[in-house]
Amino acid sequence: MSEKTPRLVRSELIDLPVVEASGVAVRQTERGAVVLVIGDRTAEVGACLIGARGELDDWTLIDLATLPGWPLPSGDSQFEAIAADGGSLVAVMREDPPVVLVADTEPRHLRAEIRLTAPAGSVLDGQWGDASSRGEGLVFLRGGRLLVAQEKRPRALIEFGPVGAEPKGLSSDDLLGPEES
């Protein structure tokens, strides 16, 4: 390669309302794109609408720890990633223990607590036990599945699905569309 690799440079710095930001997701809406951020100190999700011309609304905070049935103490989240569907669901993921919490932001309630496990005999058997080498990125997939980026040992994209379901693999048809849950 004789050409230099293109670089990205900071073109704008946007102050975030969460402590120790660790995950970002985008939800497409009729009004524009909504950027969602989560930090690894609290369960507060910051949300900001980006208008069609790039104008930013004020950040709003949704404190997931105030939802009925929220299983974690306030101020102890250790979230590594956030995902959003095309409706009102957000999912936040912890690395240790490996769990995804799914919340509906309208109306505000906890929808699911999903334990990410590696069944005996699976490709991940024996490789998912390292608490410092689990999920770092998260995407909703169709069919109740999740795509997780594993940090190391091995570096991989992992498909998690409902118990008993066979892995489907990944294609562009698996990604949720705008307004799709």
Each language-model region and where it sits:
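Sequence/structural signature of beta-propeller domains
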Residues: M1-S181
